[in-house]
Every structure is written in C-alpha cells, then in structure tokens.
C-alpha cells in the first residue's frame, strides 16, 4: 500500500486543487473552487487533498454535516476525484484512508454522492466498487436519464401537439441573460409546489460571472413575454438542465 497523506484544503491551495480537477478522470467544473466557493458561507468546508510522493493523486470535496461529513450537499454530486491512470486498488486505499482521516477528526460517518459516469472524461466506477468492498451502505438512488446527440427517438404525440401550438402562437426560443424574468417565473412555478429556488438570483448572476461559458439560459417568449425557460449547466461531456 502506498503511503498516503490527507491534507485539509485551505484557500492557498486553490490553484493546485483546480489544476488537478481539470485533468482528473471524473472531476467537473462544479468541483472547481470558483463554483464550490460561491456559497462557502453555507458550508463548513472539510475538503481534503490526497498526497503521495509530494503529488496530488486525489481530491475530496466535502463539508461537515451534523456528526458526519458529506460529499457534497452544495454540489449536484461529489465523491473522490482521481487521476486517469490510477488503479481501482488505489482508489480503494484513498477511500479507506479518508474514512480513517475523518474518524480521527471526530466524525462518525461519510455521506457520499458519486459523479455519474456520463460526466466522466474517462468513465469508470472504481469508487463504487471500492465503497462496496468497504461495506458502505446504499441509502438513496436518484433517477436520471440521458438524451443522445442524435435525438431521443420517437417523439410523443403530446410533445408534437405542444410544438405545433408553440409555432401557431409564434413562440420564439432565445438564449440570453434575462435572469430577473427567469427568476420571477421560477419562483412562481415552485410556489405551486410549496418550494423555493435552491439558488438566489444574486448567486445565479455570480456563477454566470465566474464561469460564463458554463451556464446558459434559454427561454421561450410569446409576444416578448417569457413563458418557459431552462438554466443549463455545460459540462465537458454533457448538458444538464438544472432548472426546467
């Protein structure tokens, strides 16, 4: 087993962290510090860098959550981020070491939400295999679906009728920065379900300013009035509709 060091993240490590995430097998832009730190006031950061032979070989975005740590409730997903050439055995060693590290720091459990392999640069599930071998317990499984670039296949009759209705009413699709209109529409829709937006409008604008190429806002306008919209995350391998 390689000698591994587990170092608590500090702001002076931002560049090293981001460089590793950018070249990792499964890291994405939401694991960059520019994204993670936009709501740093909400979370007690417990992120860790894994070091071997003076090199970063893994990073673990995490925050304190009660008596444990989570990776990561402030992101769509978290988990151990590791290099392209690393073997499954090393990923297991890193996760086992992280468990010991957090236990020695007084934490009692780790809640782990893995990066779906559709977002990996080089898809692999070494971490899921390692978690099983370490007797991790599955507590939740989320539903997701992917539409390939060549289309979803057969389009339902209901969607076809909706498309024709939009065309008759001269609905126009636009990309832009109409965040105030979008946020008002979003809040209105969520109120019907007794819910509120996860992000504030200030946070949406801050993320757009920090990572302008990663966020796209599309709207459907009828007579210049916004009637529907989606806020899209642009990952390296896929587009994700955060709000629709």
Stretches with model-predicted labels:
Residues 3-68, 114-244:
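A conserved beta-strand-loop-helix scaffold within acyl/acetyltransferase catalytic domains
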Residues 46-48, 58, 78, 96, ...:
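N-terminal, well-ordered alpha-helical segments
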Residues 66-79:
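Conserved acyl-donor/pantetheine-binding loop and adjacent beta-alpha core of acyl/acetyltransferases
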Residues 76-77, 107-110, 141:
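Glycine-rich, often proline-containing surface loops adjacent to acidic residues and nearby aromatics
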Residues 105-117:
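Conserved GNAT acetyl-CoA-binding A-motif
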